Each structure stands twice: as structure tokens, then as C-alpha cells.
Amino acid sequence: MLVNIKQMLQHAKQHHYAVPHININNYEWAKAVLTAAQQAKSPIIVSTSEGALKYISGHQVVVPMVKGLVDALKITVPVALHLDHGSYEGCKAALQAGFSSIMFDGSHLPFQENFTKSKELIELAKQTNASVELEVGTLGGEEDGIVGQGELANIEECKQIATLKPDALAAGIGNIHGLYPDNWKGLNYELIEAIAKATNLPLVLHGGSGIPEADVKKAIGLGISKLNINTECQLAFAKAIREYVEAKKDLDTHNKGYDPRKLLKSPTQAIVDCCLEKMQLCGSTNKA
């Protein structure tokens, strides 16, 4: 059974930890993320972007796949299925398909349009008891072909969005998607604290991959209740595949090293290990 993110994020906010949000890209990813969550006894937000959703062949594959894995793996921790950086139409489609949570990314729109569409989606989400994450201030970096320059969120706009009572708020706080450059200025802690106090909402740290652990922990202490991870899992997966091939294990015909079940075993475990590390960092271990 899938749950929304409202209760898990409120608990995280009250007890000063963060719930990990891990983007999935295929079956192995979904299985690895759920396996790690069960091992760590951590609540988990299984997420997919619209690009990954298309790659996996759509809602009709992703929703039953995640639900089926929850049952087959006997997952007992809270699991939310979340749409990451959804468009207005994408959010509506995800809600109709059975996603338990959505993030509407209207940050690139004029603020009033973002506000109006956010309000409409919150009302729509209530019909299926789904949760809604909203965004103010574009995030830097690239996400599924959408490039953001990155900007610091406006406090007044955050306050206005908060009147809609979303379940979580993603705000531009100096974070970016993908790998952080050497000249990255870092997170704006004063802004995190100010937004947390002004909105009283669980805050979301997008682009959580590559931020120094001490910085993440400080941000969690100031009000971050959801940590988004994608790039680090991708890097771990790619590294394990490269090591397997460089060791020429795929050429071992005697042991059928070319079998995809063998080739993908260590990369899938690499995702599990990465997720376990992030759950420790979030402080979500043993919180389910």
C-alpha cells in the first residue's frame, strides 16, 4: 500500500531528520531503493521524473511495478510514490494513475500563474488523498533537459505559497541538480531558516547529491525534512558496471558472465549501498 508524504514529513520535521527521496530509473532501481528502505527501517519516497517515467514506459508500468514490489518484497516501511518536477498536465496524469504524491514545478512560470495552478492541483490531490510539494525559485543545473540558472527564493512568495497549505515546499536555497561545480557558493543557511520560520512547512532540499555531509546535516537542523537523491545513485550504478566490464567478467562464457542478472547484480547492490548511506545521513534509519 502506498502512502502520501504528509505524515512522514511532519514526523521528520518534528524530530529533526529528513526522509530520503530517491529517483528510480528502472526495475532494478525500484527494487534496490525499496530493499534499502526495508533494511534501514526507513520511510522512503520512491520518485520518478517525467523523463524517467517515459523511459520506463509510463504510469501503467511504474505504478503496478512499485506496488507489486512492495508486496513481493514484503516491504513494511511507509512508501510513497512521488512525481518529481511535474508539469501541470503531468501532475494531473500522475494523480489519475495512482501516484500517492506529486511535486508541481511551476517555478519557471510567473508567480501568479504558479500560485493558481498550484491551488488547482492541491484541490485535485485531495480527491485521492495524495500529497503535494510545491516549488518557489528555480533550482540550478539540469533536470531531464530543463536547465535552471538557480535563484534564491523570495520569502514573500514562499509565504503566499504556504497559504495554500502544501505538504512540502521546495525553495531555491543555492542548491543545484547534478554535480556541483568547484566554484559553488554553498547553501544559504540564513534563507533556509527564514523560510522555515515564515512558512512552518517541511522544506525540501533538491540536488542533494554531492553536498558535503556536514552541510546536509546543518540544513536538516534548520528545517529540511526531505532530501532528494539521484545523481549519486547513478554514479554508483555506472561505476559498478564499469568495474564489472573492465574486469572482463562479461566475457566469462563458462560462468555466463554476460547474463544480465549477473551483470546487474553488483550495480543494483551499489544503489542499495548508496541509499543506506543516505538514510544514515538523513537520520531516517529506524524511523519507520
Swiss-Prot record:
SUPFAM superfamilies: Aldolase. The keyword Metal-binding applies. D-glyceraldehyde 3-phosphate binds at residue 49. Dihydroxyacetone phosphate binds at residues 178, 207-209, 228-231. It holds the Pfam family F_bP_aldolase. The active site is at residue 84. GO terms for molecular function: fructose-bisphosphate aldolase activity; zinc ion binding. GO terms for biological process: fructose 1,6-bisphosphate metabolic process; glycolytic process. Zn(2+) 2 binds at residues 105, 135. One of its GO terms (cellular component) is cytosol. Gene3D superfamilies: Aldolase class I (3.20.20.70). Binds 2 Zn(2+) ions per subunit. One is catalytic and the other provides a structural contribution. The keyword Lyase applies. CDD domains: TBP_aldolase_IIB. It catalyses: beta-D-fructose 1,6-bisphosphate = D-glyceraldehyde 3-phosphate + dihydroxyacetone phosphate. Keywords: Glycolysis, Lyase, Metal-binding, Zinc. Its EC number is 4.1.2.13. Zn(2+) 1 binds at residues 85, 177, 206. It comes from the Bacteria. Pathway: Carbohydrate degradation; glycolysis; D-glyceraldehyde 3-phosphate and glycerone phosphate from D-glucose: step 4/4. It is an enzyme of class 4 (lyase). Belongs to the class II fructose-bisphosphate aldolase family. NCBIfam families: cbbA, fruc_bis_ald. Catalyzes the aldol condensation of dihydroxyacetone phosphate (DHAP or glycerone-phosphate) with glyceraldehyde 3-phosphate (G3P) to form fructose 1,6-bisphosphate (FBP) in gluconeogenesis and the reverse reaction in glycolysis. Homodimer. This is Fructose-bisphosphate aldolase. The lineage of its organism: Bacteria, Bacillati, Mycoplasmatota, Mycoplasmoidales, Mycoplasmoidaceae.
